[in-house]
Protein backbone atom coordinates (compact mmCIF):
# COMPACT_ATOMS: atom_id res chain seq x y z
CA UNK A 1 0.00 0.00 0.00
CA UNK A 2 3.02 2.31 -0.17
CA UNK A 3 3.15 5.27 -2.49
CA UNK A 4 6.17 5.49 -4.76
CA UNK A 5 7.25 9.04 -5.40
CA UNK A 6 10.07 10.15 -7.67
CA UNK A 7 11.87 13.43 -7.11
CA UNK A 8 13.77 15.54 -9.59
CA UNK A 9 16.42 18.04 -8.63
CA UNK A 10 15.62 21.42 -10.21
CA UNK A 11 18.15 22.56 -12.81
CA UNK A 12 20.81 24.72 -11.22
CA UNK A 13 20.20 23.32 -7.73
CA UNK A 14 23.63 21.89 -7.02
CA UNK A 15 22.89 21.30 -3.35
CA UNK A 16 22.54 17.65 -2.52
CA UNK A 17 21.14 15.95 0.53
CA UNK A 18 24.65 15.20 1.78
CA UNK A 19 25.56 18.90 2.11
CA UNK A 20 24.73 18.87 5.81
CA UNK A 21 24.87 15.92 8.19
CA UNK A 22 21.53 15.64 9.97
CA UNK A 23 22.27 12.27 11.59
CA UNK A 24 21.01 12.25 15.14
CA UNK A 25 18.47 15.00 14.41
CA UNK A 26 14.90 13.95 15.20
CA UNK A 27 11.82 15.46 13.58
CA UNK A 28 8.17 15.04 14.57
CA UNK A 29 5.85 15.28 11.55
CA UNK A 30 2.22 15.98 12.44
CA UNK A 31 -0.12 15.28 9.52
CA UNK A 32 -3.53 13.61 9.33
CA UNK A 33 -3.43 12.82 5.59
CA UNK A 34 -1.61 9.52 5.00
CA UNK A 35 -0.33 10.44 1.53
CA UNK A 36 0.95 13.87 2.62
CA UNK A 37 2.57 12.23 5.65
CA UNK A 38 4.32 9.62 3.52
CA UNK A 39 5.64 12.27 1.10
CA UNK A 40 6.92 14.43 3.98
CA UNK A 41 8.61 11.45 5.65
CA UNK A 42 10.27 10.40 2.37
CA UNK A 43 11.65 13.91 1.79
CA UNK A 44 12.94 14.19 5.36
CA UNK A 45 14.51 10.73 5.31
CA UNK A 46 16.26 11.63 2.03
CA UNK A 47 17.96 14.39 4.01
CA UNK A 48 19.11 11.92 6.67
CA UNK A 49 16.70 12.97 9.41
CA UNK A 50 15.19 10.54 11.90
CA UNK A 51 11.41 10.96 11.72
CA UNK A 52 8.45 10.18 13.91
CA UNK A 53 4.84 11.01 13.14
CA UNK A 54 1.57 11.94 14.79
CA UNK A 55 -1.88 11.94 13.19
CA UNK A 56 -3.25 15.04 14.92
CA UNK A 57 -2.32 17.81 17.31
CA UNK A 58 -3.40 15.92 20.42
CA UNK A 59 -1.15 12.97 19.55
CA UNK A 60 1.71 15.38 18.78
CA UNK A 61 1.32 17.08 22.16
CA UNK A 62 1.21 13.68 23.88
CA UNK A 63 4.40 12.50 22.10
CA UNK A 64 6.21 15.77 22.80
CA UNK A 65 5.36 15.70 26.50
CA UNK A 66 6.18 11.99 26.87
CA UNK A 67 9.63 12.40 25.28
CA UNK A 68 12.65 13.55 27.28
CA UNK A 69 13.52 17.24 26.98
CA UNK A 70 15.44 17.93 23.79
CA UNK A 71 14.37 14.63 22.17
CA UNK A 72 12.86 16.37 19.14
CA UNK A 73 14.88 18.94 17.21
CA UNK A 74 12.08 20.19 14.95
CA UNK A 75 8.31 19.81 14.52
CA UNK A 76 6.46 20.04 11.20
CA UNK A 77 2.82 20.74 12.06
CA UNK A 78 -0.16 20.49 9.70
CA UNK A 79 -2.84 23.06 10.49
CA UNK A 80 -6.19 21.48 9.63
CA UNK A 81 -6.51 18.25 11.61
CA UNK A 82 -9.23 16.53 13.65
CA UNK A 83 -9.23 16.42 17.47
CA UNK A 84 -6.71 19.27 17.90
CA UNK A 85 -5.61 21.52 15.04
CA UNK A 86 -2.06 22.72 14.47
CA UNK A 87 -2.60 26.14 16.03
CA UNK A 88 -3.99 24.60 19.24
CA UNK A 89 -1.18 22.04 19.37
CA UNK A 90 1.52 24.69 18.87
CA UNK A 91 0.04 26.85 21.64
CA UNK A 92 -0.15 23.82 23.97
CA UNK A 93 3.47 22.85 23.25
CA UNK A 94 4.65 26.42 23.84
CA UNK A 95 2.71 26.51 27.14
CA UNK A 96 4.33 23.30 28.46
CA UNK A 97 6.49 23.83 31.52
CA UNK A 98 9.78 22.53 30.13
CA UNK A 99 12.71 24.35 28.58
CA UNK A 100 12.51 22.84 25.09
CA UNK A 101 8.83 23.85 24.72
CA UNK A 102 9.77 27.45 24.05
CA UNK A 103 12.78 26.88 21.83
CA UNK A 104 11.84 23.92 19.59
CA UNK A 105 11.20 25.14 16.04
CA UNK A 106 7.61 24.45 14.94
CA UNK A 107 7.04 24.79 11.20
CA UNK A 108 3.47 25.07 9.89
CA UNK A 109 2.70 22.89 6.88
CA UNK A 110 -0.49 23.74 5.06
CA UNK A 111 -2.08 24.03 1.64
CA UNK A 112 -3.04 27.60 2.59
CA UNK A 113 -0.16 29.94 1.87
CA UNK A 114 -1.95 33.28 2.14
CA UNK A 115 -0.33 35.98 4.28
CA UNK A 116 -3.18 35.69 6.80
CA UNK A 117 -2.40 31.97 7.27
CA UNK A 118 1.27 32.77 7.85
CA UNK A 119 0.32 35.44 10.42
CA UNK A 120 -1.99 32.99 12.23
CA UNK A 121 0.77 30.37 12.36
CA UNK A 122 3.24 32.88 13.81
CA UNK A 123 0.63 34.13 16.30
CA UNK A 124 0.12 30.53 17.48
CA UNK A 125 3.82 30.26 18.32
CA UNK A 126 5.07 28.64 15.13
CA UNK A 127 8.41 29.77 13.74
CA UNK A 128 7.83 29.48 10.00
CA UNK A 129 5.41 28.26 7.34
CA UNK A 130 5.84 25.97 4.34
CA UNK A 131 3.13 25.30 1.76
CA UNK A 132 1.99 21.92 0.48
CA UNK A 133 2.72 20.34 -1.89
CA UNK A 134 6.32 20.25 -0.66
CA UNK A 135 9.23 21.31 -2.80
CA UNK A 136 12.42 19.56 -1.73
CA UNK A 137 14.45 22.75 -2.31
CA UNK A 138 12.23 24.81 0.04
CA UNK A 139 12.10 22.03 2.61
CA UNK A 140 15.91 21.86 2.63
CA UNK A 141 16.11 25.64 3.07
CA UNK A 142 13.72 25.61 6.07
CA UNK A 143 15.57 22.70 7.69
CA UNK A 144 18.97 24.36 7.18
CA UNK A 145 17.61 27.56 8.73
CA UNK A 146 16.17 25.90 11.86
CA UNK A 147 18.63 23.04 12.46
CA UNK A 148 21.84 25.06 12.45
Language model regions located:
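Active-site residues of response regulator receiver
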Residues: 78, 110
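Receiver (REC) domain active-site loop signature in two-component systems and cognate sites
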Residues: 81-84, 126
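A Lys-centered signature of the CheY-like receiver
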Residues: 132
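Helix N-cap/capping motif at the beta->alpha junctions
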Residues: 32, 53-65, 86-89
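Charged docking surfaces used in two-component/phosphorelay signaling
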Residues: 38-46
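Active-site beta3 strand of CheY-like receiver
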Residues: 70-76
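Alpha4 helix (beta4-alpha4-beta5 surface) of REC/receiver domains from two-component response regulators
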Residues: 88, 102, 113-128, 141
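C-terminal catalytic ATP-binding subdomain
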Residues: 1-15, 47, 137-148
Amino acid sequence: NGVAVEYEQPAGDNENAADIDYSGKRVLVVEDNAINLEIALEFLKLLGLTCESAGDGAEALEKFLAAPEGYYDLIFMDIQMPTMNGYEAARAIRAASRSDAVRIPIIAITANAFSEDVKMALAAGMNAHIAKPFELRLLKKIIRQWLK
